Every structure is written in C-alpha cells, then in structure tokens.
C-alpha cells in the first residue's frame, strides 16, 4: 500500500508543480497531508488478494458533476492551499489499487497505467513512467491508448556490426553506405597527416609522412578501432585520442 499511495501522491504533485501556481513549500505540505489522508482512508480497504475489491472507494475523481474530490479538498484545507490553484484537469480519475495505479484523463477516454508493482521497479523507471503519465494528463502526449509505457520512451541507439574481428563494435546488420565518409571536411588535427580517415582520399597526405594506409575501399566503418589503440601502442599515422574521440561522435 505504501508504494501505491506514494506513486499516486507523486503523480498528483507533479501535475500541481507543472501548473506553477504553488510554491515548493506549499506543494510539499500538500503532498504530506494528502499521503496521510490516503493512508487513513485506505486502511481496512486494501485487499491484495482481490485488488478490484473496494476500487470505487479508493479512487480519486474529478468531473463536471463533482469538481472537487473530497480527499484532495481535505488535503488542501489542511495545508492552506486553494484547491483551484492545484491546476488539475477538469475530468480525471485515479485508481489506487494493490499492485497498480491507473489514471483516466477525460470521462470517455481509456485509462492508462501510471505504475504497476507486479515486478521489481527501479526508482528512475518509476519516475519516468510517472512523468509520462503527467504528460498524458496535461495533453502533451496522445491519450487514445490504454497504456503509454512505450510512447514516451527513447529508442536505444544501436551501433552497427562490423566485419573486423579486432573491432570493439560487434552489433548486427551493418548496411550503411561508405560513400558519405569520402566527403568529410578537413579537420585541423588531421592537417599534418598524423591522423587518418577513410575520407582522407579527398585530402592528400604530405610527402613527408613516413607511413599511411592505402585509400582502398573499406568494408568496416570502424576499421581504425583496433586492439592497438586500447593497449596504448599506436602505430605511426594511427589516430590519437583526439581523433578517436572526434570520430566516435559521428
């Protein structure tokens, strides 16, 4: 019960904070009062073996027929806060049930999950889901689906796989064309011929250079990343730390 109530209070206070009508101290006082009231109300009405039992009693609801939820109104009264300064949506329902906290923004829209406690959660994961739920409740994200767990998450960036067995990059499906690499602009740290790029064919290396790689077509975008760079033994003409850090950002 503690985690579910804390999540509901965190969700409400995030909505209040986004409205920017109350000070930080007022929000903290309101959150403390709301949590205390919810613990008092839900004690004796919490059934982990049957989460749906007492669901209507535990829900926090605001709509056109009842524009002030009794629990929120009491928390405002005990913390000396104007209810309408909370800036909550005109139609919103929050269900605080064992193992799950859900919300519905609008009476005719589908509910979505704020947090589910059926598995283990890290603090940052919970905060991310609550933040996304706040965005949905304030209209920043689409609210037509029943779950938004993936709608506000970032896609993982994958480094393509390369064919060099010495390369540190071993991710699948390298299909990117090599043509753009032959049109890179000249960089200051490569002007003296100390560094090498596949695109160096556009800029001749000075004759004084004692060693350089042939400008043949490469099948490995990261062929310059090899064991020598990480063992500290860099061959003449191989890119140094400055060139390495610059190229890895591309």
UniProtKB/Swiss-Prot annotation:
Coiled coil: none annotated. Changing residue 45 to A: Loss of interaction with CNOT7. GO terms for cellular component: cytosol. InterPro entries: Anti_prolifrtn, BTG, BTG-like_sf. Expressed in oocytes. Expressed in testis and in olfactory epithelium. One of its GO terms (biological process) is negative regulation of mitotic cell cycle. Gene3D superfamilies: Anti-proliferative protein, N-terminal domain. Changing residue 46 to A: Loss of interaction with CNOT7. Changing residue 59 to A: Loss of interaction with CNOT7. Belongs to the BTG family. PANTHER family: B-CELL TRANSLOCATION GENE (PTHR22978), PROTEIN BTG4 (PTHR22978:SF5). This is Protein BTG4. It comes from Mus musculus (Mouse). The gene is Btg4.
């Amino acid at each position: 019960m503690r985690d579910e109530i804390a999540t509901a209070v965190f969700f409400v206070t995030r909505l209040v904070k986004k409205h920017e009508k109350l000070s930080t101290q007022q929000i903290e006082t309101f959150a403390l009062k709301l949590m205390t009231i919810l613990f008092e109300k839900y004690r004796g009405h919490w059934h982990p073996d049957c989460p749906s039992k007492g669901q209507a009693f535990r829900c926090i609801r605001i709509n056109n027929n009842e524009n002030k939820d009794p629990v929120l109104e009491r928390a405002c009264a005990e913390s000396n806060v104007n209810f309408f300064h909370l800036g909550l949506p005109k139609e919103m329902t929050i269900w605080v049930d064992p193992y799950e906290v859900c919300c519905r923004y609008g009476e005719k829209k589908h509910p979505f999950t704020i947090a589910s406690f059926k598995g283990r959660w890290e603090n940052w994961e919970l905060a991310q889901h609550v933040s996304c739920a706040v965005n949905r409740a304030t209209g920043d994200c689409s609210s037509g689906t029943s779950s938004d767990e993936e709608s506000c998450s970032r896609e993982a960036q994958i480094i393509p796989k390369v064919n060099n067995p010495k390369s540190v990059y071993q991710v699948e499906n390298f299909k990117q064309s090599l043509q753009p690499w032959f049109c890179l602009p000249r960089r200051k740290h490569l002007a003296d011929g100390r560094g090498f790029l596949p695109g160096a064919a556009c800029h001749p290396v000075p004759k004084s250079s004692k060693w350089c790689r042939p400008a043949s077509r490469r099948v490995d975008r990261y062929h310059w990343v090899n064991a020598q760079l990480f063992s500290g033994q860099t061959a003449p003409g191989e890119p140094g730390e400055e060139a390495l850090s610059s190229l890895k950002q591309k």
